[in-house]
Amino acid sequence: MSAPIDVPIRDETIRLGQLLKLAGVVDDGAMAREVIERGVVAVNGEIDTRRGRQVRPGDVVTFEDETLNVT
């Protein structure tokens, strides 16, 4: 597992799919949708299959071997 990545967001929340793109762990929205719908993305330890899930600073998103800390 690689070191956690801090991902600063400019608003109070960001959609899960947008966060994956912003962090650079997926190439585009289609890939974000695919991995989220496959059930391989977790928010705060729980699998979430909703691309529009709102995440906020303090949330931790995991995908494959990446850990994203929303800041």
Language-model features: locations:
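A short, structure-level motif marking secondary-structure boundaries and short turns
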Residues: 1-2, 43
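A detector for short, charged/polar N-terminal pre-domain segments
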Residues: 2-14
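A positively charged, amphipathic N-terminal helix/segment that binds anionic biomolecules
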Residues: 4-6, 60-71
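A basic, amphipathic helix-loop patch mediating RNA/tRNA/ribosome contacts
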Residues: 14-57
